[in-house]
Amino acid sequence: MGIDTPIRKSEKLCICIHCGKEFKRKPGYSNKFCCVECEHSYKHAQKYALIIIGDASIMRANYNPYPFKKDILEEQGGVCAICGMKPEWNGKELIFILDHIDGHAANNKRDNLRCICPNCDSQLDTYKSKNKFGDRYYYRYGKDRGQVG
């Protein structure tokens, strides 16, 4: 009764590397995070930091930059990067579009990404596949720049 029992590895106290909260490690779970939300938030912040510095490991053609749309919109002050429109139109929420400034879908560097309103997007050269034979087409189908079709 008064004897100290050794702490099992599964009952080890750990500190969450995201929020700093102390927690008991559960068997089969990571001992770095107290909950799934902390793990996702931490990994999201790490990946966004790679986008900010332009790390090549995150700049792949098959990498999806859309989870960072909210972060990019916050950096822009919550308005369209071109016209400055707020995300509201006639009392309804306006969904902004994540745009690659140079039109290259594989270039996911932070300085090439911006959030724009649908009106500004429709005025760009890349709207609705107008750049159909741009770099994405040649990347996917392996065509030479001189060939079309």
Please describe what each predicted stretch is.
Residues 65-96, 117-119:
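Short cysteine-rich loop/turn motifs with clustered Cys
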